[in-house]
Amino acid sequence: MTTFLFSLAEASGGKEFHIHQPFPVLLQGTYFEINNMIITQWLIVAGLLALAFVINRAVLSGRPSKLRGSLELLIDFLEGWFASFIGSRQYARQYMPLLCTLFLFIIVSNYLGVVPTVGYGLFAPTGRWGTTLGLGIVVAIAVQVIAIRTLGAGGWLKHILHLGPLSLLEEIVHPFSLSLRLFGNIFGEETLLAVIIFLAPMIAPIPIMVLSLVFGALQAVVFTTLTAIYIGAVLEHHQAHAHHPEGEAEHEPAPAH
């Protein structure tokens, strides 16, 4: 996003509008083209893996530290937050790696659009539907895998076959609704901010960047929370099925007197 914003500012000053690509495009013109967006996502994943490695070493060291104490408080808070949607702290702890990974990837992707690198900025990957659709598909597959693990293959298939047309359509639409919501919000933000900076290039950037940081974090929270809600719906169905497998409990005949 930053590249686009500053390019617009240059264009308004009479300079040629041109966007530089920070990385070379590999295998260009083929089905296996590796463009700047893909390389940017690889860099995000590499950065998150490095961060996870550093944090893991700090936690497993066993030595008391401010970082360790802060992480314990953060984990406790996240467990409580996710448990309010998933149903229990046990389940929240079990699926926190997935949820936290999604959150970190999305928020870093959103914030890349605010990196102030004139002429060689990085676009927010989440401002492209291909990225958000991939995230939506990952969530959809993860939810179905969780359903199979909790209900069993037979129970999952029975659940799918018993869905009504609207419920089945809802299951299919989930990844698209998630991806379009995130893509639309980030792309709309980039477009709006580009127009604002084009109109007021000297006074707009700082408050607009602050707004982008808040908005980027909010979108990451929304996407992760909706994922937790989808997982919670699967687990809720499993718990209801465990208590009343075929509905016999509600319809047991009264004992004869």
UniProtKB/Swiss-Prot annotation:
One of its GO terms (molecular function) is proton-transporting ATP synthase activity, rotational mechanism. The keyword Signal does not apply. Keywords: ATP synthesis, Cell membrane, CF(0), Hydrogen ion transport, Ion transport, Membrane, Transmembrane, Transmembrane helix, Transport. The chain crosses the membrane at residues 34-54, 103-123, 133-153, 195-215, 216-236. SUPFAM superfamilies: F1F0 ATP synthase subunit A (SSF81336). GO terms for biological process: proton motive force-driven plasma membrane ATP synthesis. It is a multi-pass membrane protein. It is found in: Cell membrane. InterPro entries: ATP_syn_F0_a_bact/chloroplast, ATP_synth_F0_asu, ATP_synth_F0_asu_AS, F0_ATP_A_sf. Key component of the proton channel; it plays a direct role in the translocation of protons across the membrane. Belongs to the ATPase A chain family. PANTHER family: ATP SYNTHASE SUBUNIT A, CHLOROPLASTIC. F-type ATPases have 2 components, CF(1) - the catalytic core - and CF(0) - the membrane proton channel. CF(1) has five subunits: alpha(3), beta(3), gamma(1), delta(1), epsilon(1). CF(0) has three main subunits: a(1), b(2) and c(9-12). The alpha and beta chains form an alternating ring which encloses part of the gamma chain. CF(1) is attached to CF(0) by a central stalk formed by the gamma and epsilon chains, while a peripheral stalk is formed by the delta and b chains. This is ATP synthase subunit a. It comes from Symbiobacterium thermophilum (strain DSM 24528 / JCM 14929 / IAM 14863 / T). The gene is atpB.
